[in-house]
Amino acid sequence: MKIIKYTEKEIPDVLDFEKKLRDEEDVWGWEIDDEYIKSVKASFHDGRFNDTVSLLAYDNEKIVGRIDACILPSRFDGSVKAYLDWICVVKSSRHKGVAQALLSELKNKLKEKGINTIIALTASNDEAQRFYKSIPDSERHDTGIWINIK
């Protein structure tokens, strides 16, 4: 397995990965349509995405996992944290250390940027909960809320 930075040239592989996710589990809440693809491509040319860290795990030339985080500076306490936006491994590659390897590499990249804390909203399914409990040096707090801005 190798882990690389997600760049624009990997978009076709990422789309294949997302299709495989849906083939293996029907739990994903958005469609891979033209609008979605257009938004993903545009994100690589939008300065608002400059402080993101996105990594891909490849096995046998196919993406089997992905992790995405963004940097969150806060004047509340003068800290800079990272928000774990997404971590996912295709079902057929789970329980093989892919998610832990992605998280470890993300932590290395964030440490290079002087960031020492990752915050995340957590999925409630049992498999995800087992993963979260396996993360060393972590504490669980509160729950999450999504607020739509209309």
Task: Give residue ranges: language-model regions.
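Conserved GNAT-fold acetyl-CoA-binding loop/helix
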Residues: 22-42
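A short helix-loop-beta-strand connector motif used in the catalytic cores of GNAT acetyltransferases and
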Residues: 42-56, 83
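Conserved active-site alpha-helix within GNAT-family acetyltransferase domains
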Residues: 100, 116, 123-149
